[in-house]
Amino acid sequence: VDCPAGLGETVRCLTQGADLALVVTTPDLAAVRDARRTMQMLAQMNREARLVINRIRPSLIQQGDAPDVDDIIDSVGAQLLGLIPEDALVTPLQNAGVPVIFQTASPAAAQIRDVARRLQGEHRPLRFP
């Protein structure tokens, strides 16, 4: 279930029946803080959760304009399931109603497929975009 950011009762109710929660964040400080609070709430509910970091731009991390992936993992306190790069193909595909996952040239789609395979128990190495 794709839930909004924040910790409303809706998020709490929707995660009640989940076997596993995927906390997806972007590498900006406000989103990471929300992800940390969400992870804390899930821990209080004894829910298993994993972290996916979306829209990663390595150049921003290298310039110090975005938090490092390791810092995000430490802050959120969750096992990393995937790293999805910022991808210029995503917005046009979404606007055209085409699922990104079917775009073989998309770096984001390749990483999303790896996340899905990991969820199914397949070993896929984590690749920094």
Task: Identify the residue ranges that each predicted region occupies.
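Cytosolic-facing regulatory segments adjacent to core modules
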Residues: 1-3
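Short glycine-enriched loops at secondary-structure junctions
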Residues: 5-7, 86-87
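Short, small-residue-enriched loops and turns at beta-alpha junctions
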Residues: 7, 29-31, 58-60
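Inter-motif core of Ras-like GTPase G domains
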Residues: 8-29
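Residues at alpha-helix caps and immediate loop-helix transition turns in enzyme cores, especially N-
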Residues: 10, 34, 64-68
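Hydrophobic/aromatic ligand-binding patch that stacks against planar heteroaromatic rings
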Residues: 13-14, 41, 72
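Active-site-proximal loop->helix
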Residues: 35-44
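C-terminal lobe/tail of nucleotide-utilizing enzymes
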Residues: 44-129
